[in-house]
Amino acid sequence: MNITTADFFCSYSSLNGLPSDGRPEIVFVGRSNVGKSSLLNSLCARKGLAKTSSTPGKTRLINYFIINDNLYFVDLPGYGYAKVGQGERESWGKLLTGYIQKRGEIALVVLLVDSRHPGMASDLEMMEFLDYCGRPFGIVLTKWDKLKQAEKSKASRTIESCAPNARFIVNYSSLSGSGRDRLLASIDTFTQ
């Protein structure tokens, strides 16, 4: 897959009014501060396409980006952020689960996992939920450049044992772009 155009499309605070034009949706989900926005910017080679922040929980909406005018990348709010109120956390949870359960246009879910913390309970719960919903998913180990070689081997083994149903596992560095081509090729197989 070659990304020639990537533009912000729209943000949604509810499941009402989501695009109904039949374009496939590649969904990016993960814990708060896992690097979803940085990965999207790197993947699309567009700095600033998705707003990044060092503050967890910044993405609070469903953000749509139109790619090559024929598909959407969808950035979902992160899960697992403890510093928001219970009501807001529940609201995000309902938005996220409702979208994943009901959205017919989802072609693939890309689950981002911090390579420094593979196998966290919330990530394992998301994998189970995706399996329960029958959603094909792949895993991207983010922040790969922050690990030493021994840590990389351990992270890979851990995630492989935790995610037997993942269609692919890609090690990714948003800083260097390492893993970009492999991730794009993996996504491409679900948009044909």
Curated annotation (Swiss-Prot):
Q: Which CDD domains does the protein's record reference?
A: YihA_EngB
Cross-referenced InterPro entries: G_ENGB_dom, GTP-bd, GTP-bd_ribosome_bio_YsxC, P-loop_NTPase
Of the GO CC terms on this record, one is: cytosol
One molecular function GO term is: metal ion binding
Annotated residues that bind GTP are located at 30-37, 57-61, 75-78, 142-145, 172-174
Specify the superkingdom.
Bacteria
List GO BP terms, alphabetically. division septum assembly
Function, as annotated: Necessary for normal cell division and for the maintenance of normal septation.
* Family (UniProt): Belongs to the TRAFAC class TrmE-Era-EngA-EngB-Septin-like GTPase superfamily. EngB GTPase family.
Q: In its UniProt entry, what is this protein called? A: Probable GTP-binding protein EngB
UniProt gene name: engB
